[in-house]
Each structure stands twice: as C-alpha cells, then as structure tokens.
Amino acid sequence: MWQINEVVLFDNDPYRILAIEDGQVVWMQISADKGVPQARAELLLMQYLDEGRLVRTDDPYVHLDLEEPSVDSVSFQKREEDYRKILPIINSKDRFDPKVRSELVEHVVQEHKVTKATVYKLLRRYWQRGQTPNALIPDYKNSGAPGERRSATGTAKIGRAREYGKGEGTKVTPEIERLFRLTIEKHLLNQKGTKTTVAYRRFVDLFAQYFPRIPQEDYPTLRQFRYFYDREYPKAQRLKSRVKAGVYKKDVRPLSSTATSQALGPGSRYEIDATIADIYLVDHHDRQKIIGRPTLYIVIDVFSRMITGFYIGFENPSYVVAMQAFVNACSDKTAICAQHDIEISSSDWPCVGLPDVLLADRGELMSHQVEALVSSFNVRVESAPPRRGDAKGIVESTFRTLQAEFKSFAPGIVEGSRIKSHGETDYRLDASLSVFEFTQIILRTILFRNNHLVMDKYDRDADFPTDLPSIPVQLWQWGMQHRTGSLRAVEQEQLRVALLPRRKVSISSFGVNLWGLYYSGSEILREGWLQRSTDIARPQHLEAAYDPVLVDTIYLFPQVGSRVFWRCNLTERSRQFKGLSFWEVWDIQAQEKHNKANAKQDELTKRRELEAFIQQTIQKANKLTPSTTEPKSTRIKQIKTNKKEAVTSERKKRAEHLKPSSSGDEAKVIPFNAVEADDQEDYSLPTYVPELFQDPPEKDES
C-alpha cells in the first residue's frame, strides 16, 4: 500500500514516508525547519486516506536524483563530508528511536567536533530530501538570486573605477536602458547586418540629444551597451531577428525530423530539382565552339536515395523539361544508357513506375497539365515553399556529391569568380567536353552512386536488418520486398503525352492549325474534316499536346475530357518548319512578321504612287475627251463596230513587228533525237500531272 520515500499530503502539509515497520509508518514533514520523524499506525493512515485528509503527491526533490557534481567541485566535497558524519546514524536500525538516536548524535558530535544542531540539521535534510547522498548537496545554484534583476541604489556608478581615460562614467538607469532598447531594436534586430559598434554610435547620437549637459567622457560605454544587449536579448532571438525568414527556416531553425522517416518505402516520395552544372561544354561537331553550362535535372527516391531519373541539356529549367526528367524516372533506362554506349541490365537501374508523391519547386509545377498527374495517374504533387532548398534537401545535396566526382578532373569547371588575377586564364576557355561525353560521365556517376555508394549518414529505421548495407540499390530491393512498394506501372508514351503542354487548336481545310502550322493525320482524313465544302461540320475548341523540342508531330485530343489522342504530322503546307523546335518557329515567325511589317510600309508607299498615277491618267483622259451632241443610243450601238476596228488595227500593228528584219534562207531546225515531226511533243496545252489531283495515301498511325 505504502512505499518508502513516497510523498503524501496530510492536511495540505507534505510528508515523506521514511520507513514501514510492524504496522507503523514513520514519516516526516518536508517543509518543517525543525522536528524529527514520527510514527503513525498504518491503519490510521488508511483512515486519513478514506477521509480525504491524506493524498499522494509528486516528490518536490526528485530532481536531486539527476544531480551529478564533478569530483573536484565544492558541492561534491561538501556532500561526501556531510554524508560521512551522519552515516553511523542512518545505518542504525534504531535510528528512529529517539533515545538511541540521541546517543548516536552525541557520538558524532564528539568524533567530528560539530554541534548537535548541525547534526540534526543534516539528518533533517537527509530525510526530507529523499534519503540519498544527493539529498545533502548544497543549494549553491540558488545563491545570488539567479535569473533575477538586481538594481543598484544611489547615484554612484557601480563596479570598479575607470583606470584609463577621463571621467568616471555613469550608472545605467532605467531611462538609459530605454535608449539602449530603442537603439538595439532599430539598428541591431533587423536584417541589415549592422555591427554593434555602429549601433553604439547611433546610441551616442540619441543620448546626446536627451542629455546634452553630460560630458562625452561620462557617456555609457560600449561595454555597458553590449552587456545590456547580451543580457536582455537571448542569442536565439538575436539570430532570428538578424536573418531573413526564409534563410532562418532553411539554414538556421532546429530540425525536428528527417525526410526518410516520412517515406514508407521505394516510390513513396520522389524529389525533383534542377541546377546549372558547374562546367562549360563545347559543341560535339565543332569543339572550338563553347556552348555554355548545361542544365541538370535529378529525380531521387527519398527512401532509398536512388537516383531514378535525370535530364541533361541546354534548355532552361521549366515545367516541360521537369516532366521530361519525370518521364525518364518512370521508364526503363536501358535504352537511354545504350544510346550513350553504356550497357546495363534492368537490375542495375530497377526504377520503373509511378511514385505516390512528387515534390518539386512551385515554378516547375505552374502548368495546368500537372493536374494530369493527379487526376489521371493518382500522383500527389507537392510544391516546396519559395527559396526553401531544405524542403528538398536530399536532391539538393545530391547535386553537390554528383559534381564532386568529376570536378577535380574535368576541364572547364567553374572556379570562383570570373574576375581574373594577373596571368590567370579564363576557365571557360579550358572547356573540351561535349554534352554527349558529359552525359556519359553523369550516367556512370549515377550508376556508381546507385549501386556501390555506402551512405554513412543514412538514418536507418528500427526494422532494417543489420546485414543490410546502406547502399541505394540494396535499400530499394529490400524496401520493395519488406515495405510498401508504391511504384505503379504506366505506359511510357501515354504518360509522356499526358504531361506535354497543351493549346487550343482550330481546324480548317488546310488541317489542324497550331501557331500557324498545319497538321494532318489518317484519323482526320477518315473523318472528312479536310473536305473543301461548306457542308462539313468541323469540331471546335479542341486541344492538342505538343513537344516544344520538335514541331513535326502533335497529339490531337478529339474528345473533350478524354486522354485518347491522334498523332498528327506536319503537312507540306508547313514544310519550311520541318525538323525545327517550336522556339525556332516562334523566332522565325517573329522575324517574318517584322519583315512583313516593313514590306507593308513599302507596299503602302507604292500603292499610293499607283493610285496617284491612275487618278492623273483619268484626269488627263477626261480632259482629252471632247463633249459630243451625238445621241447616247447611237454611241452605244457603235461599240461593236468600234471594237472590231480596234482589233483590226491591233493585228496590223502586231504583224508589223513580226515581219523579218533581214532577208535570207530560212534556217532548218534539226532535233537532237531526230524524231519525226509527228512524234514531237505538243506544248499548246498544259502538261497534266496526275499527282497534283490525287489524295495523299492514308497512313495507319496510332
């Protein structure tokens, strides 16, 4: 029922149970400055408990169990000395018998040369505070009112007197503290990075306005200013106030968890991010031509740290390129490795399928097409807060480790500032790798990292077997077998088209119009949408997906709200753009519009000249036309005769021009093939080319 050292409240006074002997409970009031242990019948305590006068409570000295003073400290020596004094008493089985205890106390007094009051004080301290050696630890930590402000009385400055310089200084009063606080909160607790010395000078300016009669040598010192700053403003508050909120959250705030703990297994969460690689590349065909720094996209699995997909190219980071890397992450990588002369098996890079969650930057997800991942493929998309690289800390750190593998060897590596010292060469001129070779290096690095890198700082879960090394591919394989394998199969082309950007298109007899380019396909011909008839009802408000990298093919969605698409190819009408990207097409169209606008200005000028000439000619003709009294009907009847005479006159003039200018024998024309006259070709009528009027052959495209 009762336990030794248990603390109870009796009539709201705390008591500690010291011993339980023969139905008697020995206890002692904790808060009393005097007194000795008392015995109470156990049944009486039960009665008090029933009456509600006795209740259990927490031990106010439980913290002493955790105290561990150092061996060379005064507290340790004091505890050991006091414990040795009372040890004969507390070890006696009759220690609670007043008569026996009195004799033992007398013996201690004689042996250690101390007073009875001291011995009883130590015993009382020992019993009240838990009956352990730590109960005798002195409360030095409470000395001096720690944590409490102490204000100096009087007008004299406290502390040692000034040894150097004039003046005696001044005491920091509440008014001076107010000026300290105003200066600190205005100049130090902000993101400007003001130094303490600069802020102190601003305080001096303010102090001089409030106390103009005090000489400068008696102004509060920089040391007093710093002391107040350190005392009143904790370091955590100062740090949080002096950095931007985004920087604090990203680089300073305490971390409460890890990304791995939030991932249930492989495919549970992917992170995607891009960086501009720290290397300059050259053109593959003309190595004298320096192209620039490539864009590197990485998709990584949080649980296993497997790099599941990538993109390397010169496109700027965008939604289109991010989705290209994501499609690569969901697809088999053996083909793309083979394109770069690297042979692998599917087990070397087993990351194929859709994840549960994709975490990316907000800018990379600013497209309505990302909704297709959510609605069509059930991939939850999360966006990281702006300027919060720590939200994608795993993929961010992967960029650093990936590039560290080749930075010490590769030429053209970005090195510090572009400002060159005397005699230093520009690192950009050292570039010699092409994008193909750089991709080979990155692929080899990814394969090494996925299959052989031992991650020393990987935070493992409790159920990981001890013989499982922290290597990404082995963590992936173990997670697929023993954890929730979240990857889901998907058809690569269907995923790629669903994630491409879309735009509304119009349909005419020329084909599907997208940005002035015309497309057609076998399904469109079969539907008869290109027939040149007003009776043809062509659908409106359709959308088409396009890959900005190549204009040759688009994907028309014939039904609103459906993922079914028709592949449409560029028609001959738009053949000038074949093989180009949409960015190149837009540049060409912009240049054509510019040239057209200039040509329109020339056309306007020449048209005005033409119209002026026509008007002048008409005016001249009107002046030359005499007035006549001949009836109108007669003049109209003469039109036929007049036209006949004009034709005759025209023929005579033409005949004059056809007469030979010199006499002589007529030349004989001999054909090269000496064909008969009847076999010669007749050019009196145009040549008929059947291909001009034939329909293009239908292609079975899907």
From Swiss-Prot:
Residues 137-160, 623-702 are annotated as: Disordered. Residues 234-267 are annotated as: Linker 2. Signal peptide: none annotated. Residues 140-172 are annotated as: Linker 1. One of its GO terms (biological process) is DNA transposition. Keywords: DNA recombination, DNA-binding, Plasmid, Transposable element, Transposition. Changing D361N: Prevents DNA strand breakage and joining reactions. Residues 173-233 are annotated as: DNA-binding domain 2 (DBD2). PROSITE patterns: INTEGRASE. Residues 268-582 are annotated as: Catalytic domain (CD). Changing E371A: No effect on recombination. Residues 262-480 form the Integrase catalytic domain. Residues 1-139 are annotated as: DNA-binding domain 1 (DBD1). InterPro entries: Integrase_cat-core, RNaseH-like_sf, RNaseH_sf. Residues 105-124 bind DNA. GO terms for molecular function: DNA binding; transposase activity. One of its GO terms (cellular component) is chromosome. Residues 589-702 are annotated as: C-terminal domain. Coiled coil: none annotated. Has 4 domains separated by linkers; DNA-binding domain 1 and 2 (DBD1 and DBD2), a catalytic domain (CD) and the C-terminus (not resolved in structure 7PIK). Binds 21 base pairs (bp) of double-stranded (ds)DNA; binds adjacent sites with a beads-on-a-string architecture making filaments. The CD of 1 subunit interacts with DBD1 of its own, the preceding and the following subunit. Contacts dsDNA via DBD1, DBD2 and the linker between them. Sequence-specific, DNA-binding protein required for Tn7 transposition. Recognizes sequences necessary for recombination at both left and right ends of Tn7 and, together with TnsA, forms the transposase. TnsB executes the 3'-DNA strand breakage and joining reactions. TnsB binding introduces DNA bending. There are 3 DNA-binding sites in the left and 4 in the right end of Tn7; as TnsB levels increase more TnsB is bound, suggesting high protein levels contribute to transposon immunity. Binding of TnsB to the transposon right end represses expression of the downstream transposition genes. Heteromer with TnsA. This is Transposon Tn7 transposition protein TnsB. It comes from Escherichia coli.
